[in-house]
Amino acid sequence: MRRPILRNLFLASGLLALTQLTIPTQAAAEARLALVIGQSAYRTVPELPNAANDAKGMTELLGNAGFTVTTASNLAQNDMRQAISDFAGKVSASGADTVALVFYAGHGLQIDGENYLVPVDLDPKREADIPLQGVRLNDLLNTLGALPTRARIFMLDACRNNPFPALSGAGHGLAIVDTKAGAQGTFISYSTSPGAEAEDGTGIDSPYTTAALTVAKQPNLPIEEVFKRIRVAVAQSTDGRQIPWESSSLTTDFKFFGGDSSGSQAALPGASSMALASGTRSLEDWRKDLQGKPAMIAYEMVITDDRSDSVS
């Protein structure tokens, strides 16, 4: 009884090593890094409770999609700039095959066509204070745009109502940035159309994030299709009051999730279910099935199969 187990353990170890050499994983070919910012606890204007929930939900979704996620909440101006700088450093160190994604939920403003993300400590007394106290969206875009990456994705749920109505020059919503005028490989999604306001929502998440959390986890959807479906879902849930908008200069394909499941790309079938079909599995099938499996799961698959001819 001992020899088949030892033989199969050797097979599992050998196939794992062979698989790593001959069939590179998607994780090895494409690093995924994300920065998620949720701004709820504003100090001088009413809070946005859903922004924190939005960030929490997106952190979970992106983690399941294979991203290494950095989550930051309720950032003052200096902290937000530092978070962006630190994230850019991680992206730079990760290399040119990296997909970098930034999700921002919170207030956003535009002044003279320039967009600003709003730190929780922003307290302008006049319009001229906003460029000094805010964080320019273009600074974020340019910082990541200067780095060699496979793709840069920005999701901006930042077009909520103007938190400073006394400043008449602070425009409603955000101005659309044309990605085609900047670095290639950039995709920007706005939670609503140019100059319009986005709703915070009456549920635990905003309408935009609610749609994103549902649609983005569907398997095998190209990013363009994902955000088209998000647009349709948000328009329906808000009776047409809010229409998400995108600008893209992507030159490569991207899917949040591959495969046939709505879970993580790493959430492959377990050893027990894989073993059910092992009687007709070829060596090439073994290589594919063992791809990316932890050693103990691969071992269980092999000993469950327990076919002596599998080493012939």
Annotate the PLM regions.
Residues 2-311:
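Cysteine endopeptidase catalytic domains of the caspase/legumain-like
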